[in-house]
Amino acid sequence: MSEQVTFQSHEDRIVGKHVFGNLYDIDPEDLNNEQLLKDLVLKAVEIAHMNLVEAKSWSFGGKKGGVSVIALIEESHIALHTWNEYNYATLDVYTCGEDSDPQAAFKFIVEALKPRRYQVFFADRSSS
C-alpha cells in the first residue's frame, strides 16, 4: 500500500524548484570519499528544510569511476555524481513545495567541495 503525497501552494498549484549544475576541479580525495559525499548530501537535506525518505550511495571503480549519492526526499530528490578521472561532479536538487530551499542545499554542497569553478542553473518546474 502506498501513500499519496500532494504538494500545493496557497494558489492551489504545484511549486517545483530545480537547481542543478556542474562542479569542476574538485579535490580527488573528496570526489572518491563515498562517506563524505553521503554526509554532505544528508546535511544539505537538513539545511534546506527537506524531509528525508532514504539515501543511497554507490562507489564505482574503473577508468571513469566515481561516486553517486541519491537522497530521496518527500519533496523530490538530491543527486550528486562524481567522475574522479575528470575531477568533476554534477549536482541536482529538485523540490516541490514552498517550504524547502534547494538553493541552500546546492550552495552548502558547493562550498563544502570547494570546486575551482562551477555552473549553476535554475528551472521553475511549477504546474502553472
Curated annotation (Swiss-Prot):
Signal peptide: none annotated. Keywords: Autocatalytic cleavage, Decarboxylase, Lyase, Polyamine biosynthesis, Pyruvate, Schiff base, Zymogen. The record marks E75, S76 as: Cleavage (non-hydrolytic). GO terms for biological process: arginine catabolic process; polyamine biosynthetic process. GO terms for cellular component: cytosol. Is synthesized initially as an inactive proenzyme. Formation of the active enzyme involves a self-maturation process in which the active site pyruvoyl group is generated from an internal serine residue via an autocatalytic post-translational modification. Two non-identical subunits are generated from the proenzyme in this reaction, and the pyruvate is formed at the N-terminus of the alpha chain, which is derived from the carboxyl end of the proenzyme. GO terms for molecular function: arginine decarboxylase activity. Coiled coil: none annotated. The keyword Nucleotidyltransferase does not apply. Heterooctamer of four alpha and four beta chains arranged as a tetramer of alpha/beta heterodimers. Its cofactor is pyruvate. Binds 1 pyruvoyl group covalently per subunit. It catalyses: L-arginine + H(+) = agmatine + CO2. Belongs to the prokaryotic AdoMetDC family. Type 1 subfamily. The active site is at S76 (schiff-base intermediate with substrate), H81 (proton acceptor), C96 (proton donor). The modification Pyruvic acid (Ser) is found at S76. Specifically catalyzes the decarboxylation of L-arginine to agmatine. Has no S-adenosylmethionine decarboxylase (AdoMetDC) activity. The keyword Lyase applies. It comes from the Archaea. This is Arginine decarboxylase proenzyme.
